[in-house]
Amino acid sequence: MKIATLSIGDELLRGEVVDTNAARIAARLADAGLAVGRHLTVGDDEGEIEAALGMLAPAHDAVIVTGGLGPTDDDVTARAAARATGRRLVLNEAALDRLRDFFSRRGRELYPANERQCLLPAKAGLIPNALGTACGFHLLHGECFLVFLPGVPAEMARMLEESVVPLVLDRRSGPEVTRTAVLTLFGLSEAEIGGRLSGLERSRGGLGIAYCVDFPVVQVKLRATARSEEEAAEIIAGGLPLVRERLGDVIVAEGDNTIDTAVARLFREKGLTLALAESCTGGLIAKRITDVAGSSAYFFMGLVTYANEAKERLLGVPTALLAEKGAVSADVARAMARGARHVAGSDLALAVTGIAGPDGGSDDKPVGTVYLALADRAGCSVKSYRFAGERDAIRTVTAVTALDWLRRRLLTA
């Protein structure tokens, strides 16, 4: 099935808004075993939209359009759709009834501008929008199934999931079904991962492997398309053990899980507790720990000791040590971790100190220098790193590196 997506909006072309809708549509369709083969972006220009539809429709089985369905003068998608398909623009009574009910239930007045949102191409099928005023709709133009959705991401996502994916799947020819499996990796580059999995697709009939970088992790997506659910599941089940064997312990999570949820699960399973002392990450590790519901069962506390005085007063880092070694050093990281464990009384304590930039680096300790320390009842270990990138990238990769160290430590507990 050949599918295209079309995003509409001047704000997209100007770079004022990132087009997350196109990515979400492509990813969701891929999960359903469908591939988007082409994507276009045009501005809020009726002629440009009509031309784009005229180009895409004859070459595709389905085109999914987002944007331009609002109540303002620059929302011209419905008019362009009517022109492109040779239909009249008519007041859709079902859409108007829905809109009246939408406003009535909220105690709001229905404005004429909102009523214009119900002017749709003749014989358009409605796509329910529970979250907003824009009327989604679909048309059959020749052999092409045209779908029109609002550009508001939350509205689009719900309509995509509840209505559009089932509609598109119903139009797919053949009984093929798709199963997928997702592995999240940390510690290897995309090229290194590809090298380890080289040849696996050729040796496993029907198995497809794709790679997606979501810095600083990489996702490996296994996909099997077959004539039955059982056959597709069998292909995935046969490929997963081989992938796990080749990738080993760089796999940090599977399915919808993340490294954050993997660490949370291990803390609960092992019955251990954690304290954090952060400097250059500014609480980012603690945020990721507490983003997982139920983390209070194992996370005692997190201290952001950014200034040297805070390291001294709250963690007991000796003033002389800071003066001699500097705040960014293995010795200070070790003292921070030991101090955090002492203050919290936790089983484990992790500390981080480093230079995230853009200033503060030197020849001996350039920007990107980071020290992590992990203390437990047996002692304290320190690791040093030289990360590259801008400030946010250095802080992010530091936080994930810390979580991965916790994950590996818990696996051996």
From Swiss-Prot:
Protein name, per record: CinA-like protein
Similarity-based family: Belongs to the CinA family.
Disulfide bridge partners, by residue number: none
Pfam families assigned: CinA, CinA_KH, MoCF_biosynth
CDD domains assigned to the protein according to its UniProt record, in alphabetical order: cinA (cd00885)
InterPro entries assigned: CinA (IPR050101), CinA-like_C (IPR036653), CinA_C (IPR008136), CinA_KH (IPR041424), Competence-induced_CinA (IPR008135), MoaB/Mog-like_dom_sf (IPR036425), MoaB/Mog_dom (IPR001453)
